[in-house]
Amino acid sequence: MEEPQAGDAARFSCPPNFTAKPPASESPRFSLEALTGPDTELWLIQAPADFAPECFNGRHVPLSGSQIVKGKLAGKRHRYRVLSSCPQAGEATLLAPSTEAGGGLTCASAPQGTLRILEGPQQSLSGSPLQPIPASPPPQIPPGLRPRFCAFGGNPPVTGPRSALAPNLLTSGKKKKEMQVTEAPVTQEAVNGHGALEVDMALGSPEMDVRKKKKKKNQQLKEPEAAGPVGTEPTVETLEPLGVLFPSTTKKRKKPKGKETFEPEDKTVKQEQINTEPLEDTVLSPTKKRKRQKGTEGMEPEEGVTVESQPQVKVEPLEEAIPLPPTKKRKKEKGQMAMMEPGTEAMEPVEPEMKPLESPGGTMAPQQPEGAKPQAQAALAAPKKKTKKEKQQDATVEPETEVVGPELPDDLEPQAAPTSTKKKKKKKERGHTVTEPIQPLEPELPGEGQPEARATPGSTKKRKKQSQESRMPETVPQEEMPGPPLNSESGEEAPTGRDKKRKQQQQQPV
């Protein structure tokens, strides 16, 4: 028995900082034998330090789960939350004195469970008001600090005495650049010591420079756009006269005006007549006369025309440039319709008269010498309008007395009368003269019929307009028009006009 006691004493020896006391003579409150009774259970209770177990007298405590238990102690109400749980092996052991061991501590059995007592929320009294919670103050930056980071789209808070200057500093980049540009010239002028007027000029100069640069850029952008269509226009203008071979610039302008006055059906016929203009309009210069004579000599074997074909086309550019009123056009159309009717009627009776008309034309054409050709051209360029009108009247009146009576039919006699005031008769005469050089039956007569066209330049502008428009529709029925009566007029009028021209030319050098 001593050995185990000695082992027990050694096992529960007094620690170095404690002193051993003998047990009290009084009986303990509980002993190990009292805890082992059938009506008692051992529970481990955990409670706060100020907990008074008297407040739970007569209260039910849950042995499983959690529950709020109300207690009252010394006139005060207390609320506690009680949590119960099952015991775990080896969690805790109880030492209790035993009478059998002489008052020594012995280990007791394990507890049935654990109870945790926690302080619950205290109930507020009905009369006591709730304490208001103060709102937290907004965050502020200390006065000595300056924020460097600014979020995108946000403005930094402004604090301290520099709040008045902050809006001026937070400006856009454009305003900052303008301020830098304007401040630089002001400082330079302040050093030089100039007046306030120069300062104003310096302030305005950078703005003006910026505006000028913008204007220049806009002009440069506009110039290539404008250069595109403008560059194409002269090319179109130059292409038009290349096909016509015009030597002078004045005729280039007159040509489109003439085209606008006439119908599109007459374009093909006009081009054939205008192509001969550059050879015939160069009458004033002596160098161009030679070129003109060479061009006409090449045409002689085909048509039998030397220089006399030139005055026929000389009138055309002036006629094309002058627009006509609608009333005159109507009269001309009526005259053209009248021209076609007598022309068709004269087809049958005139055909047998072709031979007698050729003899006077053939005899009169070669009478003019070659030396008189350039003189006749120079004489026509110099005299006035009055002399031309007189020549025209004389040239038209005289041939009527010679041959018109026996040879011409009744329909064509009034065409040779120049003194008549009616315009239809004049249209008929000029219409016949245009169709003559195209006829292939008589190569000599087209040259003879051209002096009539030579006499026309002296006529008024109205006659020129009428002759030009009458030529275009009349060229289509050339095959239907009778050859001999037209050639008869040209054969009769040509020799009389040439005789008078020769007399005038012979008198001038004397």
Swiss-Prot record:
Residues 131-143 have a biased composition (Pro residues). The modification Phosphoserine is found at residues 27, 128, 136, 172, 205, 285, 309, 490. There is a cross-link at residues 270, 314 (Glycyl lysine isopeptide (Lys-Gly) (interchain with G-Cter in SUMO1)). The modification N-acetylmethionine is found at residue 1. GO terms for molecular function: RNA binding. There is a cross-link at residues 270, 314 (Glycyl lysine isopeptide (Lys-Gly) (interchain with G-Cter in SUMO2)). Residues 421-430 have a biased composition (Basic residues). Residues 1-31, 120-143, 203-510 are annotated as: Disordered. Keywords: Acetylation, Chromosome, DNA-directed RNA polymerase, Isopeptide bond, Nucleus, Phosphoprotein, Transcription, Ubl conjugation. One of its GO terms (biological process) is rRNA transcription. GO terms for cellular component: chromosome; cytosol; fibrillar center; mitochondrion; nucleolus; nucleoplasm; RNA polymerase I complex; RNA polymerase I transcription regulator complex. It is found in: Nucleus, Nucleolus; Chromosome. Residues 258-270 have a biased composition (Basic and acidic residues). The modification Phosphothreonine is found at residue 287. The modification Phosphotyrosine is found at residue 80. Its main location: nucleus. Residues 372-382, 394-407, 436-452 have a biased composition (Low complexity). InterPro entries: DNA-dir_RNA_pol1_su_RPA34 (IPR013240). The keyword Transmembrane does not apply. It is in an antisense orientation to and overlaps the gene of the DNA repair enzyme ERCC1. This gene overlap is conserved in mouse, suggesting an important biological function. Component of the RNA polymerase I (Pol I) complex consisting of 13 subunits: a ten-subunit catalytic core composed of POLR1A/RPA1, POLR1B/RPA2, POLR1C/RPAC1, POLR1D/RPAC2, POLR1H/RPA12, POLR2E/RPABC1, POLR2F/RPABC2, POLR2H/RPABC3, POLR2K/RPABC4 and POLR2L/RPABC5; a mobile stalk subunit POLR1F/RPA43 protruding from the core and additional subunits homologous to general transcription factors POLR1E/RPA49 and POLR1G/RPA34. Forms a heterodimer with POLR1E/RPA49. Part of Pol I pre-initiation complex (PIC), in which Pol I core assembles with RRN3 and promoter-bound UTBF and SL1/TIF-IB complex. Belongs to the eukaryotic RPA34 RNA polymerase subunit family. PANTHER family: DNA-DIRECTED RNA POLYMERASE I SUBUNIT RPA34. Component of RNA polymerase I (Pol I), a DNA-dependent RNA polymerase which synthesizes ribosomal RNA precursors using the four ribonucleoside triphosphates as substrates. Involved in UBTF-activated transcription, presumably at a step following PIC formation. This is DNA-directed RNA polymerase I subunit RPA34.
